[in-house]
Regions:
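Hinge/lid segment of periplasmic solute-binding proteins
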Residues: 118-174, 225, 316-318
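C-terminal capping/gating helix-and-loop segments adjacent to ligand/active sites or protein-protein/ligand interfaces
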Residues: 246, 331, 393-449
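Extracytoplasmic "Venus flytrap"/periplasmic binding protein-like
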Residues: 76-149, 184-186, 190-193, 288, ...
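Extracytoplasmic/periplasmic substrate-recognition and gating elements
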Residues: 79, 162, 186, 270, ...
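Extracytoplasmic/periplasmic solute-binding protein
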Residues: 159-169, 174, 199-249, 294
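Short, low-complexity disordered leader/linker segments with a strong preference
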Residues: 1-58, 79, 450-454
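Mature extracytoplasmic/periplasmic domains
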Residues: 302-305, 324, 336-418, 439
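Glycine-centered hinge/linker elements that transmit conformational signals in sensory
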Residues: 245-277
Length: 454
């Protein structure tokens, strides 16, 4: 399997060239299909579950951290379909999602692309409606909640309803990692049961000369505790879920978000966060945490395989605690979405790959082993193995618990195409730096949301 980890000028297929510039950001609203090209239809009229026996290349464009997983999935798919060559290309997540409209609106496009939000892509008919493939492969008989975030209404905006435009191998889950040895030093024998317990532990860590919480503020890690604090203050997930799914009239500029921003800013003021929090990215944060910098690290299950190996059994995981003991836990989740660009000429092969990564036992195991993501798929599909008591097993157990209790909600970052890089990242940086107030922060989030939805 051929693999690239950067995006130089290259030929996606012999004789076909595209300049690929650098699965949540700007430009989506302004980049539609070029007017010189023929009108698009996003719904295939002739689909097949047979991919034939002619040699073909399937180009898969994902974020760089996902490359090892898709390399493994591609190799497994090639073993089943030797006439298919899966070519995986990786790019920085923010850069990739910023440039998705350009990457899929030309005549030379990847066959599968990692998405985090849909923006104008559905409205501009740049993504393939997967409903015909869902019928052909039997996805319609699977639990449908797994597809909620990748359904888009006829208005091209509201999610959770309408046609299916994406699917993926597994699901993310947020929570808090903790260093067991450092926790023992501050007298913490079990994960905090309430937000107050967590804050008390962070104060003890500071008093002991330890960094209370490692966070990657450079590329959005501050949004994880922020959203959990918002859901705690709002007494549930409905407000933020309606907002995430672009439900008409949804508004996040509420006392709950102001309260959440106030708490997060307070953590910074108290010295609970790294002094250089706004320059720490998602590669540096887990590495520094695994080396013993920080008692706590809010992040997602995609970090579990690496931290399990690097931490030597000294790292645990717990769900973000509620305000009061006994209240339900909540967490953010999203499918690792792959979409088929309308202009791809390998729709059937791409759909076959999507079906394979959701149903093949080996592919499902790789999804958990390499990226820590519990797979979706058919209700009767076998569950991947994880070592009892391991960090990965702990994240899987947490996911199953929240799945059953309806405590999972999409990421605020996925609400619009520009929300992550253009709004949440810079606004949370300003917040923890003390350069904006909680009320100004809350208003700015809603303002940018409304601007993106125009």
């Amino acid at each position: 399997m051929r693999t690239n980890t950067t995006l130089p000028r290259r030929s996606l297929r012999p004789g076909r060239n595209i300049a690929l510039p650098v699965v949540l950001t700007a430009l989506l609203a302004s980049c539609g299909a070029p007017g010189a090209q023929s009108p698009l239809s996003d719904t295939p009229t002739d689909v097949s579950t047979s991919i034939g026996d002619e040699p073909v290349t399937l180009d898969v464009l994902v974020s760089t951290p996902d490359v090892p997983l898709y390399e493994a999935l591609g190799e497994a798919f090639q073993a089943e379909h030797p006439d298919v060559t899966v070519q995986v290309t990786g790019e920085d997540f923010n850069s990739l999602t910023t440039n998705v409209p350009r990457l899929i609106s030309g005549t030379e496009v990847p066959d599968l692309v990692r998405l985090a939000s849909f923006g104008n892509l559905v409205e501009d008919k740049l993504l393939t409606n997967l409903d015909p493939y869902a019928e052909a492969y039997g996805w319609t008989a699977w639990p449908q909640s797994q597809f909620a975030s990748t359904r888009v209404g006829d208005d091209g905006r509201q999610r959770g309803t309408g046609h299916l435009y994406g699917a993926g191998p597994g699901f993310g889950l947020t929570g808090i990692y903790y260093n067991k040895s450092l926790a023992e030093q501050i007298g913490m024998s079990e994960p905090p049961a309430t937000l107050g317990d967590l804050e008390e532990s962070m104060q003890k860590a500071k008093d002991a000369g330890l960094l209370p919480m490692m966070v990657n503020g450079k590329d959005g890690g501050l949004a994880y505790p922020l959203q959990n604090l918002q859901m705690n203050s709002a007494d549930g997930t409905q407000v933020v879920q309606d907002w995430n799914y672009n439900t008409p009239g949804a508004d996040i500029d509420t006392p709950a978000l102001v309260d959440a921003a106030t708490t997060l800013q307070g953590w910074s003021d108290e010295g609970y966060l790294p002094e250089d929090v706004n320059s720490i990215d998602q590669t540096q944060a887990p590495a520094r945490f695994a080396e013993g910098e920080g008692v706590f690290f809010p992040s997602g299950n995609w970090q579990a395989p690496v931290l399990q190996e690097a931490g030597g059994g000294e790292i645990g995981f717990f769900l973000f605690p509620p305000d009061d003991a006994g209240e339900p836990f909540t967490a953010m989740t999203a499918a690792g979405v792959l979409a088929i660009p309308t202009r791809s000429d390998q729709h059937d092969v791409a759909a076959a790959f999507l079906d394979f990564i959701q149903t093949d036992d080996g592919a499902r195991q790789s999804t958990l082993d390499l990226l820590g993501l519990p797979p979706g798929g058919p209700e009767d599909a076998s569950l991947p193995d994880s070592e009892p008591g391991s960090l990965v097993a702990g994240t899987v157990e947490s996911f199953q618990m929240l799945l059953e209790s309806d405590g999972l909600v999409d990421f605020m970052s996925n609400s619009t195409a520009s929300m992550h890089a253009n709004t949440l990242v810079p606004q949370t940086q300003l917040l923890v730096a003390g350069k904006t107030s909680p009320a100004e922060f809350s208003a700015a989030i809603q303002k940018d949301y409304e601007e993106a939805e125009k």
